[in-house]
Curated annotation (Swiss-Prot):
PANTHER family reported in the protein's UniProt record: RIBOSOMAL PROTEIN L7AE FAMILY MEMBER (PTHR23105)
Similarity-based family: Belongs to the eukaryotic ribosomal protein eL8 family.
Role according to the record: Multifunctional RNA-binding protein that recognizes the K-turn motif in ribosomal RNA, the RNA component of RNase P, box H/ACA, box C/D and box C'/D' sRNAs.
InterPro entries reported for this sequence: eL8/uL1-like (IPR050257), Ribosomal_eL30-like_sf (IPR029064), Ribosomal_eL8-like_CS (IPR004037), Ribosomal_eL8/eL30/eS12/Gad45 (IPR004038), Ribosomal_eL8/Nhp2 (IPR018492), Ribosomal_eL8_arc (IPR022481)
GO molecular function, one term: structural constituent of ribosome
Any one biological process term the GO annotation gives: ribosome biogenesis
Name recorded for this polypeptide: Large ribosomal subunit protein eL8
GO terms under cellular component: cytoplasm; ribonucleoprotein complex; ribosome
Main location: cytoplasm
Keywords: Cytoplasm, Ribonucleoprotein, Ribosomal protein, RNA-binding, rRNA-binding, tRNA processing
Name of the gene this protein is made from: rpl7ae
Amino acid sequence: MSKPMYVKFEVPEELAEKAYEALEIARDTGRIRKGTNETTKAVEREEAVLVLIAEDVDPEEVVAHLPELCDEKGIPYVYVPSKDELGAAAGIDVAAASACIIDPGDAKDLVDEIIEKVEELRE
């Protein structure tokens, strides 16, 4: 299956798993936003430290604006394969097209590592 049009770079599975883990840790020890509306607001306000975007969102237009907005605001983002897993990592019982970390809490080192790897992928 080809990637959706909003996916601008390939994320290795190992990195996506770390992103889910960072979101879970930040959920418990820091602050997160879940869902595209909350994520978009956090990016616009430049509160987000890292944005997670699911690759299996339908229709794509739900999250298609996020990569461009993140680039405009200088906020790193990472793609994860599953909106269901993203919702679970965010602590909700439904799928989440996107989520973001506002305060990484105990996940700070992990978030820094993810951001560094994403920057390498985008070079």
